[in-house]
Amino acid sequence: MFPYKIVEDVVILMPNKELNIENAHLFKKWVFDEFLNKGYNKILLVLSDVESIDSFSLGVIVNILKSVSSVGGFFALVSPNERVERVLSITNLDRIVKIYDTISEALEEVQGR
């Protein structure tokens, strides 16, 4: 569905192009079916290749965050580009979700838990 890799027990999601109303529902279903419902509770969402993101997708991110948090897991965003970072800031999502500059920085944090 979407590019990803698993490092130890951490799922690293790497969508590209756009996260929007056209694919956000599919993305959410895929994340739940393939990872959350199978017991993975450490998720990194890499946004470096995401060119744009809309409010529907932000809702999906919040939904994933809540689900991961409810089971004591870890969820973070990694390396959003300037445009996406601006959207995260305007919506104050950057105050709710941890954001890391690099995958290695985020992995270091999550694996140290």
UniProtKB/Swiss-Prot annotation:
Keyword tRNA-binding in the entry? The reply is no
User: Where on the chain is Phosphoserine found, per UniProt?
Assistant: 55
- Its domain of life? Bacteria
What does this gene product do? In the phosphorylated form it could act as an anti-anti-sigma factor that counteracts an anti-sigma factor and thus releases a sigma factor from inhibition.
GO molecular function annotations of the record:
anti-sigma factor antagonist activity
Q: Which family does it belong to?
A: Belongs to the anti-sigma-factor antagonist family.
Q: Name one Pfam family in it.
A: STAS
Processing after translation? Phosphorylated on a serine residue.
**UniProt KW Phosphoprotein keyword:** yes
Q: What is this protein called?
A: Putative anti-sigma factor antagonist TM1081 homolog
What keywords are annotated for this sequence in UniProt?
A: Phosphoprotein
List residues of the STAS domain: 1-110
